[in-house]
């Protein structure tokens, strides 16, 4: 049975007002930046969602033109049942956006991410959505799920991994392989590290974790170890898996990450005289190559 995909239950004109239950720092000492794990109470409304979807957050106040702020979309980091597995919450993984102003050189902080990162437990939050059909998990319990994330791109994959391994459901018992490639700058930036390591210990046959820690590890050329270097390193095995009809590949994170991944896959496919860009187009047509970058 195809799961009904909920979309836009709450629209920007009439958002759902949830409550912040908790807001915890995910980056440990020695890491860079701030990334928060937020849990919102949604028990009072009709908000439903699936793993791989996003919700919109409308920051309070007005922009420089006196207009209400536009919503920002964030990938959901929890399964449809929420972190407490009681169907009453939704979680986000939010990095505080900061950048240097091109003209003044001042540090500018993102409006919505700063609002969320500083949100206190008990505070109201305006939520819209859910949206997204691109990043949904297949129903097939024997599927191979390849996930490639940088930074907070881990959010949907945390939802996937909880769904696959943590929650045992009568109607969904995963027997396939889930392989996560995760790119971060420093070890303390490994978001959800403890959860990931527990899964590795508990499900060594079904879960693989490959980290690319750019400021601590070196690639074979002596440069920084980025996610695309790990893809290249494992390209032959990935190519073998990707040819299976029930393999799904998901990419989530910063816009620039796709180029390097394509390079690695291109080299592997090339060994078998396959043109990767043609092959990838076919995968996209069959809804087996899923990309969400921002």
From Swiss-Prot:
It is a peripheral membrane protein. One of its GO terms (molecular function) is ferredoxin-NADP+ reductase activity. It is found in: Cellular thylakoid membrane. It is an enzyme of class 1 (oxidoreductase). Pfam families: NAD_binding_1. Its cofactor is FAD. NADP(+) binds at residues 75, 95, 152, 184-185, 214-215, 224-228, 253-254, 292. It catalyses: 2 reduced [2Fe-2S]-[ferredoxin] + NADP(+) + H(+) = 2 oxidized [2Fe-2S]-[ferredoxin] + NADPH. It comes from the Bacteria. Its EC number is 1.18.1.2. Its main location: membrane. One of its GO terms (cellular component) is phycobilisome. Residues 13-137 form the FAD-binding FR-type domain. FAD binds at residues 72-75, 93-95, 99, 111-113, 152. NCBIfam families: FNRPetHCyano. This is Ferredoxin--NADP reductase. It comes from Spirulina sp. The gene is petH.
